[in-house]
Amino acid sequence: MPANQRKQTSQSSYLQTPRNTATPSTQDAGKSVIAPKSSTSDSSETFLTMAQTTTKSNGQLPTPSANINGVPPTVNRKKQKRRAKQAARAAAEQAQGSQTNGGPSPGDVKKQMQELEARFRETGLDEQYDDDEQLDPAEDNAYYSDEEGDAYSGSYGHDGSSTNGYAMPTTNSSSKKQKKKKKSKSSQSDNSNYAHHGPNGSSHNHVSLPIPLQSPPNMQRGPGISKEKIWNTSSQEERERIKEFWLSLGEDERKSLVKVEKDAVLKKMKEQQKHSCSCTVCGRKRTAIEEELEVLYDAYYEELEQYANHQGGDGPPPMMPPPRRFGAMSGLQPPNRLPPVFTGQQPSRGRIVEQLGDDEDEEGDEEYSEDDADEDDYSDEEPEEIPRSHATDFFNFGNSLTVQGGILTVADDLLKNDGKKFIEMMEQLAERRMAREEDAKEQYANANYGHPPNGSMHPHSHGHLHNHPPPPEEDDYDDEEDDEDEYDSQEEDYDEEEMDSMTEEQRMEEGRRMFQIFAARMFEQRVLTAYKEKVAKERQQKLLEELEEESRADSLRKAKKAKDAQKKKEKLLEKKRALAEEKARKEAEKAAEEASLREIEEKKAEEQRLKREENRKKKEAQKKADEEERVRKEAEKQRRLQEQRERQAEQERKQREAKEREKKEKEELRRQALEAKEAKEKEAKERREKHEREKREKEAKVKADKEARELQKREEVAAQQAAVQAAQSAAQASRRPNQVPTPNLSHVLASPHISVAIPAVPKAPTPIKLRTNSQQENHSTIPRTPSGIPQSPFAGMQPMPGGLQPGMPMVPPGFGRPHHDPMFTHQQPIGNQFRPLPIPNGGMPQFQPGFNMHHMPQGRGFPMHGPPGFPQPSPNGMGSIGQLFGAPKEAPPSQAHSRNQSGSFDALSSTTQAQPIARPAPIGRPSSIVHGARHGDKSSNGEPDESSKHLGSSALLDDTDEPLKVGMGPRRSSAAPGNSSRQNFLPPPFGMDRSDPAGMMSSFGTWGAPPNPFGSSSLPGSNGFGGGWNTSLNMNNSFGMPPYFRPSQPRSVAVRLMICMACQNLQSSTPDGWLDIDSIKNEVALLNPPREEPVSERELLDICDTEGNQMNGGGTFEIRHSNGKSQIHYVSDPTPHDFRAVGAPGEIGSPISGNASRNPGPPGRAPIGGF
């Protein structure tokens, strides 16, 4: 299609469709270059890039301007905009006509611009500006303006023309609709887009710098805006300041800014090529790229310096050498480039958006995206592909440098697109340079050189391939409405000559020019950033100055307020001072009057005082005479009373002396009588002791001889009995054993009193002791052992000699053993040689043989025995079970007399004759002296006991002092004569009450001794435990221990014994022996019987003050008080007491024997309680 036809079609399409007036005539298939919206104000005029009215000398149009007066619109806004667009198109047509005729002069350009401004004022296109001749913030913040153009590198003169003679085509932009806000906004663009449609429909645009129109120095500012006001400045002022800032920088500062930008680009280039191959060709290419960048940046810096140095000259210095101009007027067309729709007019569909801040970026992005979505309609139809050479890809670099919401820089391309386009451009520049060095003058259409058109593989001579990713494919877009009108020219074919019209040098210069454009854009941002930092510092300083001014004004205001307050205070003081003077004057006058009155009153008072003084003297004389008379009478009375008291005291003294003499005489007589009595008692005691010693020696000798004879007899009888039992066992196995009745012999019943065996001991000297009042009770008698033991074999059990082996001696009588103990030390324990016992008549369950029987200590041929006077275990080892759980089948009749009958060999039945002969009872004291009996105890028949006639320590007890009966059960009563009835339940052990569970479950000794059948011993030397020597205080007692003290003792004696025991137990807890009274009290509470009253602290201290003796534990207590607490130290007697032999009698008439304890304690340990 001819050029005039394309021009007519284009114009008609603009006139017919108002919507498309804002769209470019050629739709970009790829990314479009966003040109900045530039607007400037010269005095009261602001140039808007809405239409092109004039052209430069190179045939391209400058930017028109519109005057902004703030005139309110009078007609519809849409109609006004439509008329303005039509006027702009008319002006564009005139401009095209003038270009074909050779171009206008500068005077014609100014004239046309003035006409266009007047026309804009008439149509009211200034409605988008506010009243103070500033752009609306929503419009001005999001885009570049002409005011910001002065911050650029400055390659333009004051008249807005390019300094390098290169044409600066501008685009016409119109208002656009937004989908959300439904209101129109206008955008301006200063860059021209040369649409190069390739075979695949892609296009690329050559971008030129915006035209920075500078205002003259005498430019007037808007009303209310001053240069010093930095908080609210217009874009024109900011542009001027950016320019001044750049010119004010020194050479080193400008060089550092350029160097920073160069280093950033070089660093990114090295990072991009870091992973490429390390061949020589690629290495040379990298080196060439770096050298090319160095050269380009050095040239760019030199041009910047020239611009800065020639800023004040008449004409602007050339920024860069004028390259070959490619365009309609020059007659040169780049390859694969379509001719423009109309000469010099190349609208662009995009804007260069500058990053002025976070809010501005968001506004710019939103407006750009909404405008594009609302304005541009794309079709899926692809234009017919036109074959092109791969060399034309070099000029596609500009198409990829579109950044929405940011600036158009080389750094943006490196960050957003990984620098692929820029790197490809630099690689091609390096290849051209290498080609020139090697004089390889090949054509660009040769496929063997460089990159293939659509591939990414380039072979090298060294035999390896480099895989370069292909450039991103660019979508082909087509405007549906402009498809018929504007793109018919794509069907034309271009000649090969036109494709090759650009020489290599022209392409290289074009590439360098493009790089300088991009470097200017990037450097522009550097300068703007530096300027913003400076402005921020100025604003910060201004803010500090304002704050300081405010603080200064505040301090002045406070000082003024303080000064006013001080003045008020002074006025108040003056007023108070005047009032005080007036008051003082009045008070002086009043005082003078009062003084005169007081003087008159004083005269009257003096007269009255003289009269009163005379009267007083008269009264005093009379009173003195009366007082002297009274004193004389009182002295006389006192003298008489003193004489009477002296006489009475003399009489009392005489009476007292007579009484004292009489008392001394009585005491002397009593002392003499007491000494005589004591001497007499001492003699009697010594005689008794001597007699007792002789008697004991004789008895021991006789007993030893008798025991030897009886032992021999028992051995013979035991041998005979074993032979008889062995013969009868076979005969009784086949028939039921007959119940052998037990003869009712009165002499075989054991005495109710304890029989104490007195062994033969050597005679020991008895120390002479004074008779004490505490030893007045009877001594325990030694009853005689009955001569016979009641035999009652278990029902259903035949006696048989179990566990006897041939050759073993017979067990003598009285040495019964449990079945599980060895008979002799060399014999192993006898197993279960007896079958389980049948249930006794009482209904009790069976117990295994050997329960509760004594064990034999190692190395002893016979077991330990119980106390004398009790039946010994049977020869077959079942004596204990028979005594504990089995009652005799026929109980022997009880004795009518309490005395034990002597053992005799009277006629017995055949069954009794077969039993072993009991050993004779030892010689003991008369049984009338009952062990442990007290005054007032009655026997079972209700008659007073003979022992109650003896005197003892109980005679000294007070009538109110009741003896303690803790643990004392009723005494066992004698069985009635002829009572042979069987008991319904097992009888308790001897000395234990059936009603007292504690007696049944008393403690056991650790030496295998049986439970103590007597309960707690009444002897003070006894440890109070059951059986033998046991160091354990707990003694395995399930129901509590018996009391450690004698139940019949007074409370003071029992408490002192417990205190002594507590101190001995706690002696090792303290190093110095001083014990806290609380710990002693707690220990005494543990020792105190459960039914006794607890010991208080006061009682404990009082009892510690008592003197110790053999009855109450001995020793002494030391008490001290520290920090409000009492501490006690117990000191025992220095010398231990001598222990008498077992059974040795005490003093005559004493109910207890001193130190005659059956179990004084284990060897090596002192008796409990200090005895």
Curated annotation (Swiss-Prot):
Which residues lie in coiled coils?
474-733
- Here the segments flagged for biased composition (Pro residues) are 315-324, 865-874
Comp. bias (Polar residues)? 1-29, 37-68, 160-172, 190-206, 895-915
Query: Where found?
Result: Cytoplasm
Keyword presence, Cytoplasm: yes
Where in the sequence does UniProt note compositional bias of the Low complexity kind?
Answer: 87-96, 718-734
Extent of Basic residues compositional bias: 76-86, 176-185
Note the InterPro entries from the entry: Fungal_stress_NST1, NST1
CDD domains xref list: UDM1_RNF168_RNF169-like
* Gene Ontology cellular component annotations, sorted alphabetically: cytoplasm
Basic and acidic residues: bias regions: 108-124, 226-238, 433-442, 545-717
Residues of the region (Disordered) are 1-238, 307-392, 433-510, 545-739, 863-996, 1139-1171
Question: What keywords does the record list, in alphabetical order?
Answer: Coiled coil, Cytoplasm, Stress response
Per UniProt, the ranges with Acidic residues bias are 125-150, 356-384, 472-503
Function recorded in the entry = May act as a negative regulator of salt tolerance.
Q: Which family does it belong to?
A: Belongs to the NST1 family.
What name does the UniProt record give this protein?
A: Stress response protein nst1
Q: Which gene encodes it?
A: nst1
